[in-house]
Every structure is written in C-alpha cells, then in structure tokens.
C-alpha cells in the first residue's frame, strides 16, 4: 500500500457518498479560531464545526489529555464501566437537574435514546396508547429515521419510506397550537430552546413556561434537545437555565467533546428507572478516550470566565453585524442567543446564504447557513476580540462584493 495518497477536492466527488456539498478547499490544520487549507491559506473560523469546537481547534489542554488517555485505555465496551465515564457523568449530574446519564456518540443517538425513553416511560407508567410525540416545524433532531421524523423538516425526512407513527408537528413558539394537540395520549413534547438548523430562532420564555405547564397537566415529558444550544453556547451551561424551567430529559453532544465524538442524554432517577439491562445500548458510547477529553472540555467550559465571556462576544458580534447592516441594509433580523447567532437576509438577497458562504471562503472566512435565508455564526466560545474583528472585516468585504 502506498504510504501517501494525494487528494484534493475533486477526490471527494470520486470516493464519497454524495450527501454533502463541501467547500472547494480542504482544511488541514487548525489552531484556536484559525484554520489553514492544503495551500497554506488562512481562514477565520466563525463556523466552529457547527457549534462543536467551543474551545477552538487543537486546544493544548485537550491535546494533552487525548495523548495521555491514548496511552492508557481506548475502548472496553459497555460490558465494563470505566473511570472517565463515571467522572463525567457525575460532573453532568452535579451541574444540572439530572440524576442519571446515558452516553452515546452523536446528537442523533442521544435524541434517539431520549425519544425511546419517553415512549417507554409513558407505556410503562401509564398505558400502551400514550405514544404521541409533539415536535415543531423547522426543528432538527438528527438523521436516524426516528429522529429525522421527529424533526420538522420534510426535506430531510421524505423519500425513505414509512416513518415512525404518532408524531405531530406544530408551529414553534405557538402555545395555542400545542394546546390544540396535546392530550392524555401524548408521551413527550420535544423542542430545541434555540432552533439551530431551523433558522436560529430562540424559544420565547412565555412559550417555554406554557409548554411546561401543559406537560405537567397531561403527564407528558418535556424533552430539550440541547445538542447545539448546550455546553455554554448560549452563555449558560445549558439553555434551559435561561428560562427557569426544568425539563425531564435533555440531550447534549457537539461541544461536549470539542470535536471528539461523544453525546449524552440526561434525566431523573424516576424516569430512568423504567430502563433495564438490554433496553437500549451502544458499543462505543461512554468509551474512556471520548470521556477523558470531554471531562477536560467540560471543566474549561463550565467556568464563570468562559460562560460570562459568551455574552460579551455575542454583543461584539451583533454590534459588528448591525454596523454592516447600517451600511448595506442586507439583514432583516439579527437574532439568537450567546454565540448561536443568525442574520436573516432580506430581499433581494433572500435565498443567497450559500452564495455568501462561498464568497466568504474565498475571502478567508468560514461561515454557516441555516436554510437559504440565514447566515449562522457558531464560533469558539473563547474566540478573541481581534479574531472577531478580522472575521467581520472579511464578512463586510463579502457583503460589499454581493451588493
């Protein structure tokens, strides 16, 4: 076998399943909030791996723990437990309402576990007909057949044959719509405190409180998908903490491992008690390598300095976006929480988010979209003010080119 195979962007089209349309450059190295491609070109990273690298690329403390654990123990399966997993579970419990933790590898897997648990709990504690799940238009919960069906975006869910039954979608932030469909056959209401893929729309406090009251009235579990909004992204460790409302189940992933694949589902003793050995599982979930990295990432993120810094950086980025908008009048709304920010394009630039992403890459800036009309910003939680300013300068160059 050859020691080195030369690859470029064209190689992707020749060897990969055509389910993505990646940028024309290939990143090969990252440090903090900067990335370099195969040709040495530098980029400011406002994408953060889609809200994953909360502490930036190749954080030295995380690199050290990865090396250290890599020389100890990588994987042993769920037939045994391990120290890093137990330590991480205890940290998550100490920092939240939760009392029990399940580890998996991705947000989709954590959500799959949450939805299965919600149905299993309702059937075990109530009756076999209490299986309806209420979710929201423009929601996103993963790509398994169950999670993509709970997600409220037909463009992702259609075309794969019969979907899991008993899933209803209603408009986000519409409490009356929830009231109209919730009943004693409902097992769960599932929502993102901030819809990420759906356009970076935050839940209104009155809506969250109203949903909690409806869930209590009908003995329904409230599930918060915090895969994108959790782990400090909005300035609190988890977004539910902004609302003075306690969900029954939360899921987290993405920034939990700062890029090393790991996810978790958190719940209470009472709800977890319906699960027995064999009721659910995963081969890789909670492996010592992932949990060792996540332990250190958690320790760094869950500090006053990092969490308070999120709001400061939010204000700085929004101020820059407002300044750009003053000059070019391109955004209809700038919204979001913390460092999960959306800038909605207005006419005549609606639908051009992907074009802006391409222009941004050409100008040395990594950006995201949330649909065709919204630019999404999910940088590192510790990105420097200088890097924010440089990135926004590059964004303004892009907007100037566009208009």
Curated annotation (Swiss-Prot):
Catalytic activity: N(2)-acetyl-L-ornithine + 2-oxoglutarate = N-acetyl-L-glutamate 5-semialdehyde + L-glutamate; N-succinyl-(2S,6S)-2,6-diaminopimelate + 2-oxoglutarate = (S)-2-succinylamino-6-oxoheptanedioate + L-glutamate
Biological process annotations from GO: L-arginine biosynthetic process; lysine biosynthetic process via diaminopimelate
CDD domains listed in its UniProt record: OAT_like
Gene expressing this chain: argD
Family (UniProt): Belongs to the class-III pyridoxal-phosphate-dependent aminotransferase family. ArgD subfamily.
Enzyme class: transferase
Organism of provenance: Photorhabdus laumondii subsp. laumondii (strain DSM 15139 / CIP 105565 / TT01)
Residues binding pyridoxal 5'-phosphate: 107-108, 140, 225-228, 283
GO MF terms, alphabetically ordered: identical protein binding; N2-acetyl-L-ornithine:2-oxoglutarate 5-aminotransferase activity; pyridoxal phosphate binding; succinyldiaminopimelate transaminase activity
Co-factor(s): pyridoxal 5'-phosphate
Protein name (database record): Acetylornithine/succinyldiaminopimelate aminotransferase
Compartments, record wording: Cytoplasm
Cofactor stoichiometry and binding remark: Binds 1 pyridoxal phosphate per subunit.
